[in-house]
Design a protein with these regions (language model features):
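Structural/interface elements that position substrates and couple domains in central-metabolism enzymes
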Residues: 1-160
């Protein structure tokens, strides 16, 4: 992203829009934390699941993954963390310190009080049915606006 800004400046382009997008992207983890605290002011001991560790779906690329800052912020608040990604398994990454890596979406959400969707994997669209089948109603924070708020008892979406 930094390279894109430099390239744009080299070509004489106004980079204010790209800079604004970058500022918004960097503020997303704090926004997610803010939405969680709206429902649970203290996150100490909260069971939080982060879904999606890859930078984007259908890849195992974790470079600049938006999940890592989210995990760090929740860890700083004392949350008990679980994460799942269908392909990416970054067990050695610093951001995964103290995070339980689940084997499936079901294992990841079964005991969660808060579920944060970070990457748009198609299988995460099955959450409403999964929650219904298991009689679960965690707070769902949809960081990608791919889920319908009407499908969840407690829903927060970035930009909604």
């Amino acid at each position: 992203v930094t390279a894109l800004i430099a390239q744009g400046k080299d070509q004489g382009l106004d980079m204010s829009l790209l800079s604004a997008v970058l500022r918004i992207n960097h503020s997303q983890p704090e926004e997610i934390l803010k939405l969680a605290r709206k429902h649970r002011p203290s996150l100490q001991g909260a069971r939080v699941t982060v879904l999606g560790l890859a930078f984007k779906p259908d890849t195992d690329d974790i470079r600049e993954s938006p999940a890592f800052p989210v995990l760090r912020l929740f860890r700083e608040q004392g949350a008990v963390l679980t994460a799942f990604d269908p392909i990416a398994k970054p067990v050695e990454h610093e951001a995964m310190r103290g995070v339980t890596l689940a084997n499936s979406t079901l294992d990841a959400v079964r005991d969660a009080e808060i579920v944060v969707l970070v990457t748009r994997w198609d299988e995460f669209r099955q959450l409403p049915q999964m929650f219904k089948n298991l009689n679960l109603s965690p707070l769902v924070i949809d960081g990608r606006r791919v889920l319908s708020p009407a499908d969840f008892a407690v829903y927060e979406g970035i930009g909604r």
